Amino acid sequence: MTHHETSAVDASSASMHVRSTIDVPPDLVVGLLGSADENLRALERMLSADLHVRGNTVAFSGEPADVALAERAISELVAIVASGHPLTPEVVRHGVAMLVGTGNESPAEVLTLDILLRRGKTVRPKTLNQKRYVDAIDANTIVFGIGPAGTGKTYLAMAKAVNALQTKQVTRIILTRPAVEAGERLGFLPGTLSEKIDPYLRPLYDALYDMMDPELIPKLMSSGVIEVASLAYMRGRTLNDAFIVLDEAQNTTAEQMKMFLTRLGFGSKVVVTGDVTQIDLPGGARSGLRAAVDILEHIDDIYVAELASVDVVRHRLVSEIVDAYAEYEEHDLGMNRAARRASGARNRR
């Protein structure tokens, strides 16, 4: 790939404009631009510099900083295509967002890290924070993954668990959740205990079937290699040589969280995931996830990975919905505080 030096267009104006060009290897142009130029359009929407493509040459013009960002974006996207990974508008958006956010990391390195491959489908991190989260799982025995819905915290943890089993780093996978959800308590639901708990574990089953051969899963579950169970079934056990994922951990009590973490045995790894803004515990009880992070985050070999709305990898509207609700709840909290202060002032008169 050839880069031609930038040249000043209007050096006398208050805001200098520059131009530059990059020659893309001819065999990579189609992959870079995408079907019907969909990748180019996604790139143009995210960049302030003007982009023009002629043959295998990409020309840029605009403010120096904008052109520099566009040049680096093209270079990183070309590297992704050259590595053999498919480039999509979603990958373009995540790559440019990464450059805008920090500029210190290579999107090509982050977005081409394969965690798990199955039947042509690849699981890989799509944001810088997801990459840091995955790296933390590799480097630590216990990792807390905290973030809103759609940030991939559970899916990536399960992908790492399946990979660890396939590469014989562990001999079994244990997936667990507390059986508490908004608006429902198990005692009021019909059916046996197993029938009551199963719907709460369904998201874990869904992810598992997405990552492994469906016909293999029942055999692995019947032999105990894979276990999907309510958190209550963890009590009194020591879990050796296992990859253990606790999902929806914000709905554990402090006692449950302590019980769970002390199940850790030799050769095991634990990933705890949750969203501290979605606590469904009755009576305003303090979340065991919050307590655990406060108590344990300074301990070596325990890592707290925080993901945010910028890491949401579902439909683009999901991140906007997450931000809108956070803003509304912050405003609502401020209004309630103001009302309490006003009420207190009246009572003191």
UniProtKB/Swiss-Prot annotation:
Localization terms from the record: Cytoplasm
Binding-site list for ATP: G147, P148, A149, G150, T151, G152, K153, T154
Organism encoding this protein: Mycobacterium leprae (strain TN)
Gene3D superfamilies per UniProt: P-loop containing nucleotide triphosphate hydrolases (3.40.50.300)
Keyword tags: ATP-binding, Cytoplasm, Nucleotide-binding
Pfam family, one: PhoH
Principal location class: cytoplasm
Superkingdom as given in the UniProt entry: Bacteria
Phylogenetic classification of the source organism: Bacteria, Bacillati, Actinomycetota, Actinomycetes, Mycobacteriales
Positions of disulphide bridges: none
GO CC terms of this entry: cytosol
Protein name from the UniProt record: PhoH-like protein
